Design a protein with these regions (language model features):
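Internal active-site segments that recognize and position negatively charged phosphoryl groups
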Residues: 1-18
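A detector for short metal-coordination/catalytic motifs
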Residues: 9, 19-22, 30-112
Length: 112
């Protein structure tokens, strides 16, 4: 399933923090479920394994990642106060980069 695929890709760790507490991790869709096709909803390239607070920010477009994997946050978000790294860079596949480009351009509130 989707979560199991993400656990394999991200080695059962939060892509952002490295947290390995399974109960704290969420299988997060990059292109939101509500606008994704059936294929995109199940495509593991359209997902990140994130701790719950990072998932909440990502889902609401308050954080995102550029195509090169660099973390970006809305200007009013204090990542350190949330226990999140303020300078992170993820390594992901080119297929994931395409989904991330969509998220950065269409979901992230600070894209323009």
């Amino acid at each position: 399933n989707f979560r199991s695929s993400l656990e394999k890709i991200w080695q059962q760790r939060c892509a952002l923090t490295g947290c390995m507490i399974s109960a704290a991790l969420r299988a997060s869709h990059i292109k939101p479920w509500s606008i994704a096709t059936d294929h995109e909803r199940l495509d593991p390239n359209n997902g990140l394994l994130l701790v719950a607070n990072a998932d909440a920010l990502f889902d609401r477009g308050l954080i995102s990642f550029k195509e090169d994997g660099s973390l970006v946050a809305a200007s009013y978000i204090d990542l350190a106060s949330l226990g999140l790294p303020d300078a992170a860079k993820l390594n992901f596949s080119s297929a994931t980069a395409e989904y991330m480009k969509f998220h950065y351009q269409n979901v992230f509130v600070g894209a323009n």
